[in-house]
């Protein structure tokens, strides 16, 4: 798989790094670790929203060399929960994120997959927290999906599962898997280690802004690594053919 993004000695004051790594096309990479590990800081840096020490190459070019307009065509970024910036119909908000605004069928498909069919005419400031999160997710998917944006390469998601129920999380997993199969690179933060063990291809385990481990999910999410990150003891079990992590007392 080709390298989409290369990080070299990336650091930000006392909050992050230095750390290095690479993001590959057609894979889902999870950032895991305790609160304050630096996951959100790292995602914002990878999105080009902040600057600091070290270097990031995106599609073979320095990240800082990308204009905001061009960057928005090649990568999409979902930050942590935000309130709607202003009131407008959901369909209008989603349309603003589409590069090809004639693809109304795609908008309807993505909205339907995230159970937003009956919310398209509602104002963004009249949504619940979970509804707004799904609208935001639909927006970044529409922005970057190769179906309508052949230039799309990278999707960055900061705790995308927040405020989603089990069915909605499953729906999002299906969408992300489909995007991955179309060649998109996906990087997302997660607090659900078992979800990472099931759905990520690779993982970066962070603590205190440092990278404790990186590699295939099974190699990273080991009891010794997790004990070092969280200060708690874990066991990894096989239950009906699925691996699962549990805390031990």
Swiss-Prot record:
Pfam families from the entry?
Answer: ABC_tran
Membrane topology, as annotated, equals: Peripheral membrane protein
Can the keyword Chaperone be found in this entry's annotation?
A: no
Identify which top EC class this enzyme belongs to. Answer: translocase
Q: Where in the cell is it found?
A: Cell inner membrane
Q: Which InterPro entries match?
A: AAA+_ATPase, ABC_transporter-like_ATP-bd, ABC_transporter-like_CS, ABC_transptr_BtuD, Metal_Ion_Import_ABC, P-loop_NTPase
| ABC transporter domain segment(s) | 1-233
Organism superkingdom: Bacteria
Q: Name one GO cellular component term.
A: plasma membrane
PROSITE patterns for this protein: ABC_TRANSPORTER_1, ABC_TRANSPORTER_2
Catalytic activity annotation: an R-cob(III)alamin(out) + ATP + H2O = an R-cob(III)alamin(in) + ADP + phosphate + H(+)
Q: What does this protein do?
A: Part of the ABC transporter complex BtuCDF involved in vitamin B12 import. Responsible for energy coupling to the transport system.
Q: Which HAMAP family match?
A: BtuD (MF_01005)
Q: What does the similarity note say?
A: Belongs to the ABC transporter superfamily. Vitamin B12 importer (TC 3.A.1.13.1) family.
User: In its UniProt entry, what is this protein called?
Assistant: Vitamin B12 import ATP-binding protein BtuD
| Upper classification of the organism | Bacteria, Pseudomonadati, Pseudomonadota, Gammaproteobacteria, Enterobacterales
């Amino acid at each position: 798989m080709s390298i989409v993004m290369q990080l070299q000695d990336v650091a930000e004051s006392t909050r992050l790094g230095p750390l290095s790594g690479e993001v590959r096309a057609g894979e889902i990479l999870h950032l895991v670790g305790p609160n304050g590990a630096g996951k959100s800081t790292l995602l914002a840096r990878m999105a080009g929203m902040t600057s600091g020490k070290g270097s990031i190459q995106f599609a073979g070019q320095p990240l800082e060399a990308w204009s905001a307009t061009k960057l928005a065509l090649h990568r999409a970024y979902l930050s942590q929960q935000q309130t709607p910036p202003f009131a407008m119909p959901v369909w209008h908000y989603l349309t603003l994120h589409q590069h090809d605004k004639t693809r109304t069928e795609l908008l309807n498909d993505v909205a339907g997959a995230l159970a937003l069919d009956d919310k398209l005419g509602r104002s963004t400031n009249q949504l619940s927290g979970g509804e707004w999160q799904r609208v935001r997710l639909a927006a970044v998917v529409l922005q970057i999906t190769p179906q309508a944006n052949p230039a799309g390469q990278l999707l960055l998601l900061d705790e995308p599962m927040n405020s989603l129920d089990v069915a909605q999380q499953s729906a999002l997993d299906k969408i992300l898997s489909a995007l991955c199969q179309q060649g998109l690179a996906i990087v997302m933060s997660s607090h659900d280690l078992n979800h990472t063990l099931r759905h990520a291809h690779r993982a970066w385990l962070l603590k205190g802004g440092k990278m404790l481990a990186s590699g295939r999910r099974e190699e990273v999410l080991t009891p010794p690594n997790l004990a070092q990150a969280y200060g708690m003891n874990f066991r990894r079990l096989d239950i009906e053919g699925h691996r699962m992590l549990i805390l031990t007392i």
